[in-house]
């Protein structure tokens, strides 16, 4: 009896002892080559990503060089190395602090022949160190390439390829690979590029060029012949570091591959030679905002001191953000986005449609506009739409109560366009110069018939607003807020994005308009728009508390829609005639 009980325990103990005796395979050694110039704006996020790589630091070496800086790149790197350098197998630190620019350089983003050569020499020096140290691999990653996937190094090593790059996303169609190259060494467009970039085909693909971030194996005879500098004896292509190395691989019979089977991270779009470091920084901030929406976000290193942000309201009296308390992730993303752009904002807790019932609505004096139906589905007003309207309404009341001359209103699902802050500031400066009388300016909306909208004379960035959907971002004047409140909309409510076109007399339904007078709101819109929704109906991440909700007068909890109306679609689909009686003209594009 006792033996029968003891036997399973002995068997289990034996299994544990055998498991303990099996040691984990030793991971390959890798040199992380860091070559930085004028990278103060991106270094905190770049270094933070390197810190979070899921790889034993004892198997990693740091080879770090910096030169010709006009900012605090050297100081940041020195601070970071002092904090984390001891955790790595070895550290090479090569700062060049004397020269701030190259001869004949027109600006910090101008690539002269001497600059290309110096970069190639540095990469060659890093490669020589890796070989002498006996490393298995060397990873080159530009300092504005942020590897948000902490498995990147392991995933690339597992491919067992001589030169392999993780495909990086950017603000545009730009990435770190070419699918085609001309006989002269220039970029060639191919049919494969966009399906690869858009991940319509996924895997690892052989390409003639990878650059910016790539892993180079040091374990094969072929790669032992590779060099960044000097160029191959037969080289006659342009004197450019990435093209020189692509030719070296071709001459040595070494294949290059790009992998897009995972989301590895992000890269900043390259600025033009005449552009400034400030413009590059602005681009990188937009990249941070895109990562906050699409995920995973970029996280800065805690071991680097960053310049403090100087928050302001951009010349407005207040910046409001409408956000549901039960959507903390959306609120956090929105506040992080505004912080990155140095915008100070006041959070307004949105009225939650889930908390509304008939008695509350009766107490507030809320009643449905007679005859209102959704222009597509024919459904009535939802409690989510009532909550949204009341949230905006509370801001209009605050604007009037505080006498705020002009404000900005954001919902918490805004995707900001590039250079949002400066473009908005410039737009408002132009409006002031032209002495335009305005009540409301859309910054983000869904245009229904954009071809019918008229440009504002003297203001090329502005149009007279036509019938539009969404209220995700707009500016509002004190006079505009007074007009909206004076119409007493709570007693004849419709969705707020239908109400606004009624008030500037551009709604196609005359029956709705008949209940409001005067309809003299002076409404305009930025063109091009400065904001769009983070997601659309049909996207995996799409979430709406207005589209999917209960009927406004139904306390049973029954939902009107599980999929969202056509208003929330990415495509136009605006050619249908809804049961509400107004038809929507078709148009060929959905311009947000």
UniProtKB/Swiss-Prot annotation:
A motif (Prevents secretion from ER) lies at residues 589-592. It is found in: Endoplasmic reticulum lumen. Pfam families: Glyco_transf_25 (PF01755). GO terms for biological process: cell adhesion. CDD domains: Glyco_tranf_GTA_type, Glyco_transf_25. Its main location: endoplasmic reticulum. Keywords: Cell adhesion, Endoplasmic reticulum, Glycoprotein, Signal. Residues 540-592 are annotated as: Disordered. One of its GO terms (molecular function) is identical protein binding. One of its GO terms (cellular component) is endoplasmic reticulum lumen. The keyword Signal applies. It comes from the Eukaryota. Residues 1-19 form the signal peptide. Belongs to the glycosyltransferase 25 family. Probable cell adhesion protein involved in leukocyte transmigration across the blood-brain barrier. Does not express any beta-galactosyltransferase activity in vitro. This is Inactive glycosyltransferase 25 family member 3. The lineage of its organism: Eukaryota, Metazoa, Chordata, Craniata, Vertebrata. The gene is Cercam.
